[in-house]
């Protein structure tokens, strides 16, 4: 599963050379859980609810202070990563990127249409997604 989202100002936690070894250990991300943005936390929870084990997040899977050549290669591979993922979680609501994914932790009060995907997960929509995306910052990004 991949996460495509707008970072927002001052990303709380990213992968850097200093924490790479710790993050590479099994369950290494648990140590940093409180430092993760709500959007990333919600995407992790959603990935688990989908029954999947892996989530690719650019801020955590690309070493942000890597040398230029390594970082350029990683950035050039992003299209392939998104294309070959099982599915992409698209967090296109850029009004407040730190709010997380609506409806993952707290139930939504808005009326919406649902399609049940599993016993614990439903897909919901209350608007025409294509019109919504045209107006978002997310739509201006190169690999979406």
What are these regions (language model features)?
Residues 1-143:
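Fold-level signal for large, globular catalytic cores of enzyme and receptor domains
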